[in-house]
Amino acid sequence: MGRLFGTDGVRGVANRELTAELALALGAAAARRLSRSGAPGRRVAVLGRDPRASGEMLEAAVIAGLTSEGVDALRVGVLPTPAVAYLTGAYDADFGVMISASHNPMPDNGIKIFGPGGHKLDDDTEDQIEDLVLGVSRGPGLRPAGAGIGRVIDAEDATERYLRHVAKAATARLDDLAVVVDCAHGAASSAAPRAYRAAGARVIAINAEPNGRNINDGCGSTHLDPLRAAVLAHRADLGLAHDGDADRCLAVDANGDLVDGDAIMVVLALAMKEAGELACNTLVATVMSNLGLHLAMRSAGVTVRTTAVGDRYVLEELRAGDYSLGGEQSGHIVMPALGSTGDGIVTGLRLMTRMVQTGSSLSDLASAMRTLPQVLINVEVVDKATAAAAPSVRTAVEQAAAELGDTGRILLRPSGTEPMIRVMVEAADEGVAQRLAATVADAVSTAR
């Protein structure tokens, strides 16, 4: 990867690492690299954001960068990341920009860029944009003047267009379902409850009052306790949790038990296989997916293709193999027939549709997968590469792997967006998984 882009765009503490100057430069560089030169009509970029306070500042800076290069900024306001991806294609825009740090804390922010059709950029394109930002490449020509300067346009119909799009995910009415949705005070605070109500569900929305400061604060897909409590209090059939930009969806059943991205993928894969919609009888998952997913799919006659962690790699494999379902344990679920990236609202609608069509509870559906005990420890480090390559860490990993044998696995993965290394251990016995994960995590934290 390059110097600015991580696994999910450019991120950092807003106004420190991710400054207005950098946002302007990214907007201008994206305009130079991605806008369709020589095409008839004006060049256009779709621009959206989540509700965190710094989004307004960064939006203004990106707009300045876009318009200074002669690209109109089609502003869609506060909408989920998958909405920006969809609208990039729906408006036939040159590219799209989303300002969000997803599940990260409020002080952080990020900039994600989508190419034509709303597809994530490949590494080469990101490197070319970085070269323009960093001055390695000068880019073409002089900047426009007069009528050639880009304009700012508010897309008044953006939300309605997106809601009409996601409605296609519900192929049955959800009139008998009661669902609690935790919107994380994020980008889906309006769209998610509206989408679920339009499909017929009785919706109890929580954490759906964004004020710019409360996004992901003790709520959403990374903090499920409020959702569990609300599901039990309202005796709902299920609960759905989104993150700050709503490209994720996790669930809890009527008992408050977690149904994570792996279990959701199993439920949807079985539904799609039954309907003849699971292309090549194949599911795409990452190396972080639980062994239980692989066992469940094997027994159902479904092949699992494994990628590196990050929905961009899932997307690449889906496109390369023309597959129809993929995702991550974290709740990024991708169905190319319904979107070019993970969409938490689409996932929620598909999951509830399966419940209605089968007459089964979410608990019963999720029981198709037996989750093996999995322990994940995030270790903060100064230098991810140095810590991961340290001899003491390699020794700890080798010893843990030898003890596990064929009954489990260990994975060491540097985060693509944060200064940490993730240590993951799966084993038939939870105590063994906890012990080995703690041993390896200690080796990582003390590595020199």
Swiss-Prot record:
GO terms for cellular component: cytosol. Pfam families: PGM_PMM_I, PGM_PMM_II, PGM_PMM_III, PGM_PMM_IV. GO terms for biological process: carbohydrate metabolic process; peptidoglycan biosynthetic process; UDP-N-acetylglucosamine biosynthetic process. It catalyses: alpha-D-glucosamine 1-phosphate = D-glucosamine 6-phosphate. The active site is at S102 (phosphoserine intermediate). Signal peptide: none annotated. It comes from the Bacteria. Activated by phosphorylation. Keywords: Isomerase, Magnesium, Metal-binding, Phosphoprotein. InterPro entries: A-D-PHexomutase_a/b/a-I, A-D-PHexomutase_a/b/a-I/II/III, A-D-PHexomutase_a/b/a-II, A-D-PHexomutase_a/b/a-III, A-D-PHexomutase_C, A-D-PHexomutase_C_sf, A-D-PHexomutase_CS, Alpha-D-phosphohexomutase_SF. Its EC number is 5.4.2.10. Mg(2+) binds at S102, D243, D245, D247. Catalyzes the conversion of glucosamine-6-phosphate to glucosamine-1-phosphate. Belongs to the phosphohexose mutase family. Was identified as a high-confidence drug target. NCBIfam families: glmM (TIGR01455). This is Phosphoglucosamine mutase. It comes from Mycobacterium tuberculosis (strain ATCC 25618 / H37Rv). The lineage of its organism: Bacteria, Bacillati, Actinomycetota, Actinomycetes, Mycobacteriales. The gene is glmM.
